Amino acid sequence: MKEMNSKSNIAFTLAEVLLTIGIIGVVAAMILPTVINETKEKEYAVARKKALATIGEAVRLITVKGSIRDASNAEDFVENYLKKQLQIAKTCDNNNLRDCGIETGTDKILSLAETKMTMPKTVKELASGISNGTVTDPSSTSYGFVMSNGYSVNLFYNPSCLSDDKDANHWGQDRVCVNAIYDMNGLAQPNEVGKDIGFVTVLYPDIRTQAVAPDVHKKNASSANFYNAGASCAKLDPEYTLPNRDELLAMYFNSNLLGITSGGYWSASEASAELGWGQSFDNGGRYRGSKSDGFDVRCVRR
């Protein structure tokens, strides 16, 4: 009899079991979206680093060999130069980018600002004022390809790109040799900049070549002078910092993807003891501004 009573004391009623299951379900419903979102964010961060390590390094090697300006257009560059450095499974001309998993439908992708937009197919669709560049052809078209890891890439190329100039103000767009917009999962959702869509930008046709793929915050930090711009980023989000002048130039060149249509922004790069480097998102101008001047601030995570 005692044994039977012991068993009955530890038994659960159906109501208790259902209540427990219900509580577990509620907790799971609260926690799972956060866990899934954090997992996705890590995947997007890994994709950005992979794109930078593969595309950026491949173009850098071409540059070091002195061949970065030898191609005639984006198609020639991909087919006859990039293919020697990067495993490419498929290529597509500008009229058939969707065959390479690049969504080109009208308003089918989301900018970083979460506004509907159309994937750029010509250089002039990348940023405001890009035609101000002296050696940048705004009508130049992109070329598409699929990497061996499944990433879809929409690549822009400038055979006339110029070396860096740290002694004078200049047009930033003229320093971009290659700009590659990637989509880690092709036509699949979410097709959103900052998530499955990002970009790798390669600057300068010489040994000073730089490849960057900034992870850009969705909104501006508070405007500030050069001295306080970094702190403005930290106040917005401690994981973010002020971009250097090359990262900031890449952001301008892809400003339509980011939803940044105007403004003058500080970089973290000094021009002199009194001057810092800034970037105009209105016309592409790279300028040296007084460190005491107040400009816009947009932050990045590395």
Model-derived segments and their meaning:
Residues 8-40:
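N-terminal single-pass transmembrane signal-anchor helix
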Residues 221-240:
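A short alpha-helix/helix-coil micro-patch that ends at or immediately precedes a cysteine
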Residues 153, 186-197, 221-227, 247-250, ...:
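Short, surface-exposed beta-strand/loop "edge" segments at domain boundaries and coil↔beta transitions
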Residues 41-82:
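Membrane-proximal N-terminal amphipathic helix
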Residues 1-7:
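N-terminal secretory signal peptides that target proteins for export/translocation
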Residues 212, 229, 266-267:
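Bulky hydrophobic/aromatic "packing anchor" residues in well-ordered structure
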Residues 239, 245-302:
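C-terminal, surface-exposed recognition/capping segments
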Residues 76-211:
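Intrinsically disordered, low-complexity regions enriched in Pro/Ser/Thr/Gly and acidic residues
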